[in-house]
Amino acid sequence: MKTFTAKKETVERDWYLVNADGKTLGRLATELARRLRGKHKPEYTPHVDTGDYLIVINAEKISVTGKKRKDKIYYRHTGYVGGIKQTTFEEMIARHPERVIEIAVKGMLPKGPLGRAMYRKLKVYKGATHHHIAQQPKVLNI
């Protein structure tokens, strides 16, 4: 009996809608990364993108435990000498709440072309509306 290997042409992908309201950031991000990779499917193959599309709404209502709301710091670099910038979790939620979830999930995906393809299937929105009604996403309770 041969080991089954998924082919990228035959992988069936579904669209799921996830509500981030009241969810803990890390616990939500791990489940999103797992589903983007396709590890929840029996036909999971490490070198093939077998994951589903995920739409996350209410990104601004995500929660963190402890004092991370004030203490957690996100760093980025402009590319210029001495151009390191830092933003706290509170500031990030106020300005770009979708980036908080995107950064957390991106760090949990593989680095390289396959990881970037998986990351592109994640759609995060502030508020309860999204632009993917035509895909008829199924509600996913995490």
From Swiss-Prot:
Entry annotated with the keyword Ribonucleoprotein: yes
> Which UniProt keywords are listed?
Ribonucleoprotein, Ribosomal protein
Gene Ontology CC, one term: cytosolic large ribosomal subunit
Q: Name one GO biological process term.
A: translation
Listed GO molecular functions? mRNA binding; structural constituent of ribosome
Q: Which Pfam families match?
A: Ribosomal_L13
| The keyword DNA-binding appears for this protein | no
Please name the InterPro entries in this protein's record: Ribosomal_uL13, Ribosomal_uL13_bac-type, Ribosomal_uL13_CS, Ribosomal_uL13_sf
Q: Give the family from UniProt.
A: Belongs to the universal ribosomal protein uL13 family.
Q: How does it assemble?
A: Part of the 50S ribosomal subunit.
Matches recorded under HAMAP family? Ribosomal_uL13
**Function of the protein:** This protein is one of the early assembly proteins of the 50S ribosomal subunit, although it is not seen to bind rRNA by itself. It is important during the early stages of 50S assembly.
Put simply, this protein is called Large ribosomal subunit protein uL13
- From which organism does this entry originate? Hamiltonella defensa subsp. Acyrthosiphon pisum (strain 5AT)
